[in-house]
Amino acid sequence: MSRMYETIYIVQPDLGDEEIKALSTKVQDVIASMNGDFKRVEDWGTRKLAYPINKNPRGRYFYLRFDGDSGLIAELERRLRLDDKVIRYQSVKLETEVVAPAAAPVKSAEEGTEEVAAEAATEAPAETTTTVEG
């Protein structure tokens, strides 16, 4: 049974473009060879880690979203674990398809200001002042 998964993996920040491309291709080949279907692949770039991992204060993040079965996850995580360039990885099963929220409809300038003023009047907290004598 095919399920939706997300995987984020972090690689060493000092890798060259060729090494990163080769690693990314290898990861995508594992998913494709096990009949996985890519939904999204993103390179989030180099970011500061919350704490140093293997003496690296930074890491380059990659995000994958794909369909596959549990055997695919086991094989993907095995390959990521064996690769010395990968310093961390995490895979999670998504319960449902995640859909980005729709943008709010654009209102005309007159409608928007009237509604904002009405909302501000109803949502404004009551001001209270207390005097402390000492």
Curated annotation (Swiss-Prot):
Any Gene Ontology CC annotation: cytosolic small ribosomal subunit
A GO MF label: small ribosomal subunit rRNA binding
Range of residues in the leader sequence: none
Domain of life: Bacteria
GO biological process, one term: translation
Region feature (Disordered): 103-134
Low complexity bias locations: 118-134
This protein's UniProt keywords: Ribonucleoprotein, Ribosomal protein, RNA-binding, rRNA-binding
Record-stated family: Belongs to the bacterial ribosomal protein bS6 family.
NCBIfam families registered for this protein in UniProt: S6 (TIGR00166)
Described purpose of this protein according to its UniProt entry: Binds together with bS18 to 16S ribosomal RNA.
Listed name of the protein: Small ribosomal subunit protein bS6
Gene it is expressed from: rpsF
